[in-house]
Amino acid sequence: MSIVLGRGQCGAHITLLFTIDDSSEDLVYQGSRGAGICLKDGVEAIAKGDNGSGEIIVRFKDGEYDSRMYQDVLSELVEEIPEIGDFDWELDIIMSLPTSQGFGMSASGAVASSMAIQRAIGIPHEECVRRSFLVAHIVERKRSSGLGDTTALSSGGVERRIAAGSPFSGSLLDNGPGVSQGLSLIHISEPTRQFAI
């Protein structure tokens, strides 16, 4: 095998209001209903894989952060795609917003890193995106962190989460129990006219 490279990016999310729904034992069905705003800024991840046994080294561009979440992302991916475990991974993380400030940066980082690793081995774009949201949701719930950030991020814009759970699940990753709707606004204005006096 040769060295493989992949990149993933995911914006952040600010929750405005929410209700918790964690009554199911199945992590895929846990989450929240609510509303929030998705941001363009978030996390960029660059993955480099080389022959190995599924080890991971995580480097952060600015600052020191806990890398265990990224190890959890890799573990979940190996369960989904065993071939990923045939590589040792280097993951470079670039954060454009602070952590632990309500921006959903753990969800953003989990989605971005999952995308980067899958893209490195050539997983098709849509499958990669859907699986990344599922993996991020499971990692977030196992770590008792985000409840609805991944579902919100799957919609984008100003979002409302109608049903709790992962936005994608199942063997075809075609839908989840989680449902969200995103609204994006585009403002188009006419050029200002200048008049000579």
Language model regions located:
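ATP-binding N-lobe of GHMP and related small-molecule kinases
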Residues: 1-100
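Conserved hydrophobic/aromatic beta-strand scaffold that supports enzyme active sites
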Residues: 7, 17, 44-46, 150, ...
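Charged catalytic carboxylate motif
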Residues: 69, 73, 112, 187
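Gly/Ser-rich oxyanion-binding loop with an adjacent helix/lid
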Residues: 84-170
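Acidic/histidine-enriched ion/cofactor-binding microenvironments in catalytic or ligand-binding pockets
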Residues: 168-182
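Single conserved hydrophobic/aromatic residue that forms the stacking wall/gate
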Residues: 186-197
